[in-house]
């Protein structure tokens, strides 16, 4: 009978769905296992990256279920955001209609791949049933002081018509549309992620065992902890006298403060306008600031950047030396790092050195190597190594590391500064000036000011009866039914906040909502949340290392502190899968190299597509899609089908690894049983310990080869039939997490009761792996000429002697010259003749 993948796969998908095969709840005595792939944005169609990601997750889910775990494996939709809104505008439809139509299509595609999701837990973040709880979180954060509103320069995407968080600006471009990001002063809502900077950093130690080192390192660098000091530099007032105004700098090199000869400010520093007010330098400074503010942040931090600046006409005073220090605005100083002001020490900082050389600014050596003296006139680069302090008053002669502590002590006792810790991490701007997002539950009242909504008024519904603007501007400010409201505090006229929340807010807690997705009287069922969380295995792309993963970690900690959960980290283990490439490049419509999963499923079947995605490479590595590769996977599935057909009158309905030593009485039986148990051991270890699905599949392929070699010799007696049946059952059981449909079909066709989905993972035995003898393949010039049995562990000489005396081999060696004999113990002998 021909392998009809279409009807077979649909039949079993329907069977699983109707029987609730993958339903789970938290009322179980089994150990729990929560496996989750990052949920998709409903773009309309799944792509091969989705297939690989979700196939990896499905193997893990099915494997853990076979190991006896109570497995939670849900799916949902990251449904708010710019892409849906922009696509809907482009196609002349409403974002809601566009989104839900895409969800329906993608759900059908995912079902067609046979993934073991508990679809009862499906959620979409754009529904009021979901975002009402997000609005409630906002209110709790507001009460706790974790959310606040301020005006500040923001990253503005002119194409998307919205602000971007720092993490959403990639090399100066919008992460969504690649437009150049501009700076714009706006009043926005922020979450105080910086309140958790130290905990976010410290808890990375807990994740090192289960997360890729690369991701942990990326988060450490993004949080960017620096231990140093703040130093206050008084501003020089009119006539050279000091006044109460000052510039505070953060530095990790307080040991160099005696060498600070000028001050560098970021173009965005709030003091710039004050310093240049009424000065002749003002026009040049303003022009410079305008030009630099929109430069790429990454470029501005580059060592290769040409250092540029402009003098403000103002001065400050070095609090240790009394030196009059000119204040410059420099392109390499960033407002978001430290205080946005840098004490310039050109003799000991390379950027300052280049800047000072360019603008002929003074240098002062304050650290030099022991036994040597540095001359600023002769220096070709800054001295940035360790050394002894000079020209540093009472600290002269101290090693610079020791001087750091002494000078920090002096700062604090003199009131000139203080020890402090600085973080690169900045608070999370969650305001977005677009329509398709969760409304921020705040109103503005002339009498009461900024007022948070009441819980009983949630959800603040996103109105669906609006007309979106073609240029992407939000229609909410122009929708009176939404924007005009009553003040929750005084009942008077008020106006709603018309910004919506960053969609990364939705994805920062969805994993917890899955534990009780249908609960309508609270965000979470406490018992279910406690049982299922944290996620045991999270799977997704490394591109989310900072944005989504860092935000989710913060959100869990903030929700914990608001009493929603007793949890520190959301994801115990993380797997970052590689990309699926075509012809060495990322698949994209513009490149014309997209492989459509729907087309591949129709042609080859879901099992084949799954198999190829899992076999092509280890999961963390990229792999190149190839037609020959998927053809090879299709042939392998066909080979299993034919094997079952050829043995249809021979196979018995038995469990995997059920053949006994007595059944395997012949050498061929012993070899096959040994191979069966060795395969179970290897496949189990490869999947469980390393997620090396490709090598597990390769091991099963070897077992199939062994079955083809042994089937004729073992089909004739009862013991041989049991050995064959056990090995075939093992092949199907090992493949059931990978190619579940054909495994179910053949399992049933053999006459087994129940579904293979419900079978336990096979157990190998030491007894079956122990061998008295082993079979050695004998080749002459690479061609198979015979097999010999030798005692297990025989040495190379004994194996060679047995091979050369094998009758068929000996006959082929008559009248030829043996050049070389290659012996691979336990496997083969190759005789080279010529």
Swiss-Prot record:
GO biological process: leucyl-tRNA aminoacylation
Alphabetized GO MF terms: aminoacyl-tRNA deacylase activity; ATP binding; leucine-tRNA ligase activity
Catalysis performed (reactions): tRNA(Leu) + L-leucine + ATP = L-leucyl-tRNA(Leu) + AMP + diphosphate
E.C. designation(s): 6.1.1.4
Binding site for ATP: 589
Pfam family of the protein (one): tRNA-synt_1_2
Keywords associated with the record: Aminoacyl-tRNA synthetase, ATP-binding, Cytoplasm, Ligase, Nucleotide-binding, Protein biosynthesis
Record has tRNA-binding as a keyword: no
This protein's GO CC annotations: cytosol
Short sequence motif 'HIGH' region: positions: 40-50
Compartments, as annotated in UniProt: Cytoplasm
Motif ('KMSKS' region): 586-590
Disulfide bond annotation, renumbered to this chain: none
Similarity-based family: Belongs to the class-I aminoacyl-tRNA synthetase family.
HAMAP family: Leu_tRNA_synth_B
Protein name according to UniProt: Leucine--tRNA ligase
Native species: Nitratidesulfovibrio vulgaris (strain DSM 19637 / Miyazaki F) (Desulfovibrio vulgaris)
